[in-house]
Amino acid sequence: MASTQLSDIFVADYYGTLEPANSPEKTAVYESGIITRSATLDNIAKNGQGTSEISYWQDLDADEAPNISSDDPDDLGAVGKAEQGSMRARTLYLNKGYGVSDLTAELANSEPMQHIRNRFGTYWTRQWQRYLMGAGRGIIAANIAQNGGDMVKDAGASISANAFQDAAFTAGDAADMFGAIGVHSVVMNQMVKQDMIEYLRDSQGKIILATYLGKPVFMDDALTYAPGQFLSLFFGQGAFGYGEGDPHMPVEMQRNAAGGNGGGAEVLGERKTYILQPAGFSWQGSENRNLSPTAAQYASAANWKRVFDRKQVPFAAVISGTATP
């Protein structure tokens, strides 16, 4: 009996309408509110350029005292100035292909296209979070290098509640803006041992979310600072803006008759156009459309520059652990 081939069941238009069970939008990170989809970033992602400038109005200077009104017509009030600034956003052009041998189990399912779509959903979710955490590491590294680390506190050998509190209050009276925390598994272990973690459970008692002071806590072992040291990141509401473009061919199935030593080979590929923009920071890296940065390059201090004042930036961090040679 002949086995099912990808080409036997693949219908591009139908495939494109399927929602992956594990799409980025369904992750706890996205649902926490720290990432906000932006129509502006959607439009930029669709413009076909590697980078674009985003203009914004700077806040009025609250340190300027108001004029004192009088009845003297010649007493002219001082006029303040509203100024614009700009930041650069980087578009990511990404793709991934799976060969038919990678999808054998999915082809055996009663809904093979949905299962294949779910496989891609899981893949993109992991990549998406790597870029997000990479950007978080990069902007903190940039803050230390360029701004004297005014968003960062050092906890010493082990994490503590005091260190978390001190980090949050680097934002002064805006400290209540933080809505989620990302930590390394070593730090999470320390938090659990110190009874800092509370858990949300579903109706069956299954843990669905770990929290600290009501804030979701996410584990990612990419959150290191140096050998032996860890980076815990605070994210505020809307910490990242998110946009998605329209690849010319977002999904494509290719069959190569000569592949497989003449037995035929099939590859299903997806293409993504993303923007993930940390609030208050401007991209300083490569602008080449054909050289999209990797998640590791997102984590480089040299690729980011803060353009907002400290209190307007929804990020803070704690460094913990003991550096090893």
Placement of each model-derived feature along the sequence:
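N-terminal "assembly arms/tails" that initiate or stabilize quaternary assembly
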Residues: 1-89, 293, 302-325
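Extended, compositionally biased alpha-helical segments that mediate assembly or anchoring
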Residues: 2-8, 239, 243-325
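Long, contiguous amphipathic alpha-helices that act as assembly "spine/axial" helices in icosahedral shell
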Residues: 54, 83-145, 176-182, 186, ...
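Short helix/loop capping segments that flank catalytic or ligand/cofactor-binding pockets
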Residues: 62-65, 108, 190-193, 199-200, ...
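Short, cationic low-complexity segments
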Residues: 77-83, 206-216, 220, 289-307
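Alpha-helical scaffold segments that mediate packing/assembly in large oligomeric complexes
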Residues: 102-173, 293, 297-314, 320-324
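Extended, solvent-exposed, turn-rich assembly/linker loops in the middle of proteins
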Residues: 141-216
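Extended serine/threonine-enriched, polar tracts that run as long, contiguous segments within proteins
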Residues: 185-188, 196, 203-267, 271-272
